[in-house]
């Protein structure tokens, strides 16, 4: 399963193609974060490659304690927060309060129920902001961001790293003095309880996937630049990073499918 985050789409299609090379048949399910965790906990879905810890998805791990498995750590230094274009002359979340009109009193969000949306719902009263949080999606958010930047308009969005938009645009993450959005997080691959026992080779392979800043940025950029052809973009990326991909594949004789 995967949600609409750019990094989640990227690593999910990457995992799918690597598993396909190893002879596995996979089915992708696109859904919001909350239904994904519910489906994993009920054993209806096998794997989710974009779980953020220890803050963003902590509520789901607490709710479904004992029903999920952590396979591995994909990325080491993920962040969430509020983001503005660099030409907007503010640097902190507090400063949003003095410029409500310039931002039309709106923070452009993504899918409802995601960790970053929950944090933003807390940040608005915490910082005393008179803003409404707009529910949309990752692709819709970046489309509105691009439209505003093209016109040099003021806009504030919910943003996170890793994301290709930081390569495409000159952006600034607003300082969060009250630490509503937490510190740096890690992105994990997780599974339903029992998956590792039933599919030890696949679980080990997925758990081995780990990407640096440069690697995940290049993967996301390849997908974003070839919208609608994720499979082809991922295969091309794999061809250019074959040694890395091969390093993730366990010795088959150590596992029985």
Feature-to-residue mapping (PLM):
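Short, well-ordered beta-strand elements
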Residues: 1-7, 19, 24-29, 104-108, ...
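Short helix-initiation/N-cap motifs at beta->coil->alpha
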Residues: 3-6, 24-39, 133-144
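Pocket-flanking alpha-helical
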Residues: 12, 32-66, 143, 164-170
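Ligand-binding cleft/hinge of the Venus flytrap
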Residues: 14-23, 98-134, 239
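Ligand-binding pocket segment of bilobal, Venus flytrap-like solute-binding proteins
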Residues: 45-49, 116-178
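A conserved helix-loop-strand patch within extracytoplasmic ligand-binding domains
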Residues: 66-113
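Periplasmic-binding protein-like
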Residues: 74-81, 139, 162-213, 217
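C-terminal functional modules
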Residues: 213-257
């Amino acid at each position: 399963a995967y949600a609409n985050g750019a990094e989640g789409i990227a690593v999910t299609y990457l995992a799918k193609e690597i598993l396909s090379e190893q002879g596995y048949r996979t089915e992708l399910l696109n859904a919001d974060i909350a239904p994904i965790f519910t489906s994993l906990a009920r054993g209806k879905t096998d794997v989710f490659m974009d779980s953020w810890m220890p803050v963003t998805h902590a509520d789901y791990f607490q709710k479904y304690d004992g029903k999920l498995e952590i396979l591995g750590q994909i990325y080491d230094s993920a962040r969430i927060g509020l983001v503005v274009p660099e030409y907007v002359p503010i640097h902190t979340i507090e400063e949003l309060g003095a410029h409500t009109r310039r931002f039309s009193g709106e923070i452009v969000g993504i899918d409802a129920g995601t960790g970053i949306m929950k944090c933003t719902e807390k940040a608005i009263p915490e910082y005393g902001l008179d803003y409404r949080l707009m529910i949309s999606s990752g692709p819709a958010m970046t489309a509105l961001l691009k439209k505003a930047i093209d016109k040099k308009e003021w806009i504030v969005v919910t943003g996170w790293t890793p994301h290709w938009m930081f390569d495409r645009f000159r952006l600034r993450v607003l300082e969060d003095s009250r630490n509503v959005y937490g510190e740096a997080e890690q992105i994990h691959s997780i599974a339903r309880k029992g998956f590792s026992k039933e599919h030890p080779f696949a679980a080990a392979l997925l758990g081995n996937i780990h990407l640096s800043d440069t690697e995940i940025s290049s993967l996301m950029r390849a997908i974003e630049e070839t919208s609608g052809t994720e499979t082809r973009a991922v295969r091309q990326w794999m061809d250019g990073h074959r040694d890395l991909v091969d390093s993730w594949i366990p010795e088959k004789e150590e596992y029985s499918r």
